[in-house]
């Protein structure tokens, strides 16, 4: 393999610029300052542009996320020259690539979805077309169009990285850019569009009265199971898929699926394993809400409403993605000195603790710091917006800026990468000696599940997070 065929994110090695905690502190000060300034300018309801409506702001931050994934993971920074990517100063590179990503985001939202699809295919993508319908105000037209566009990005932000992480870019892995990038992009875009039609399109068909029986399945097919006609049911499990993809890529190191040595079987198992884990996580988060707040009540307007409960499943999942990416990027995916299963277990525990802490801090103080509404289920309360906004900034810092200022970049040769891949394969070999540990792990997992189920009602009765 020639060095120029290695994806840039794989050929680089980021090392701390200073000893001790100073690199982490420097990057946190840098990224959180950018978050605070940009949040005030673009999102904060008390700020300047006030995109937090909430769907307009959510649409932008969600599409920014998928554009970053496309640029770094799928196109490998094409059309920028590899020499410029390697040699440009991190600040210059971060600024240029960020501006390009914002331009692409605006092109996709306002160019393709709003003006092309909205004017020639689906009315609900265009605020201008929606305002021509009787009874729709400018505000709701804008919100509905933003919601429709955002829902596609939700699906794409799961499918696009999953194609790389689980399917390893097959069948175009050996193509050069831009053929490889456009092939994967078109493949994942079309698959995302099919999933959109089967999940989100029916939701858009019920937002205007009378329901659009001829063009959508109304009421949607999931109504009896999910106890709601809202596509928040799909937002729940798809958001969990998005989170689990990055768990698998980062803190889990694709374990235990990396133990499967047959490539085709491994890719198939990993892709659908991500979905299976996500569904389990989705229904567990739903059950947690029932343990804390009681049964969902169809027709309720706030925290007992099934549609909000499903939305909150996705919101809960995203709280755990923040510490997972922090640990992967700035924590060096600590620990690394034990066996892979032990490393994965410790990281998962740390991410669980971190996710709970972020969840509690957000609902306790976000209305002061971010200008959001106090409480859990207010229509203006969308925690996924600030969480994904922060994640976007971290991705820019780590992918575009090579971890500057706390980290510096070194380049690895193809021989070093192959040697590391062989070492990873050796660590990922199945052994019968793992069977006792596997049995203990399953037993411990079952015990932990019942312990959480028993503890949640007690914590709910004795602690109040939001007064």
Question: Model regions: which residues?
Answer:
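N-terminal signal-anchor module of multipass membrane proteins
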Residues: 2-75, 103, 107-108, 154
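C-terminal transmembrane-bundle signature of multipass membrane proteins
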Residues: 28, 32, 36-43, 232-253, ...
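Transmembrane alpha-helical segments of multi-pass membrane proteins
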Residues: 18-31, 88-108, 177-194, 263-280, ...
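N-terminal, membrane-interfacial amphipathic/helix-forming hydrophobic leader that caps
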Residues: 28, 86-96, 118-130
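Alpha-helical transmembrane segments of polytopic membrane proteins
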Residues: 24-28, 53-70, 95, 109-110, ...
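Internal, hydrophobic cores of structured domains that mediate oligomerization or house catalytic pockets
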Residues: 110, 114, 118-137, 152-220, ...
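Membrane-helix interface motif
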Residues: 36-50, 108-130, 194-218, 280-298, ...
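Cytoplasmic membrane-interface regions of multi-pass membrane proteins
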Residues: 2-18, 71-94, 156-183, 205-209, ...
